Amino acid sequence: MFIKEITVMNFENYFPLWNDLNTAQKKLISDNLITRDVKKGTIIHNGNLDCTGLLLVKSGQLRTYILSDEGREITLYRLFDMDMCLLSASCIMRSIQFEVTIEAEKDTDLWIIPAEIYKGIMKESAPVANYTNELMATRFSDVMWLIEQIMWKSLDKRVASFLLEETSIEGTNELKITHETIANHLGSHREVITRMLRYFQGEGLVKLSRGKITILDSKRLETLQRS
């Protein structure tokens, strides 16, 4: 019981709508809240096979992606500390048919509000319903931005942008990442990414080694992604 109380107290500090809930709604969430510690590489939500519920990241990093008919992956967006994901509970919104997979990119601690619990509260609470709509709109804005990148931006610019994003996330210019991983994020093929990275290396932008990419000239990468 004591551990459960600590879990709920921690959740209160992360869930932005806690103070907008009434006593019964708070109890409903507290009684049904799921805590999960997942290892890097764990699939948390798997397309239309699951209706996991609302995810709230306490610490760690998640990746939300879709699969093409050919099995190629492309990252839609990532989730970091205090981020929430609704696409893992899209089954509660009949107008949304969006099959995504959610994977832990790092060891992650998270909370899950079961889909039916969240759906019930959303029907009762205008603040929760409004916030849900705003969050969903933000995520679809992210997806539309991604589509624009794929349609109108050349691969060299997208790779440069991805490498700069990774250095910002990891806080280092030495990235422990494979060419296959980059291909999965960008919806490309490993061989294509390898050729592009070798071109970058020839231009003095990066240095390649086994399982690692070192950024040598971030300013030129920034210029490339903006050009």
For the regions a language model picked out, list residue spans one by one:
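Cyclic nucleotide-binding regulatory module and flanking cytosolic helices
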Residues: M1-K39, L79, M84, A89-M93
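Cyclic-nucleotide recognition modules
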Residues: Y77-N133
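Polybasic "coupling" helices that flank or enter modular domains
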Residues: E105-K106, K123-S188
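Short phosphate-coordinating micro-motif centered on Lys-Gly-acidic
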Residues: I44-L49
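Glycine- and acidic-residue-biased ligand/ion/polar-headgroup-sensing regions
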Residues: G41, T52-Y65, F80-M82
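Short alpha-helix-to-loop micro-motif enriched in aromatics/charged/Gly
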Residues: D69-L76
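Phosphate-/nucleic-acid-contacting segments
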Residues: L155, L164-S227
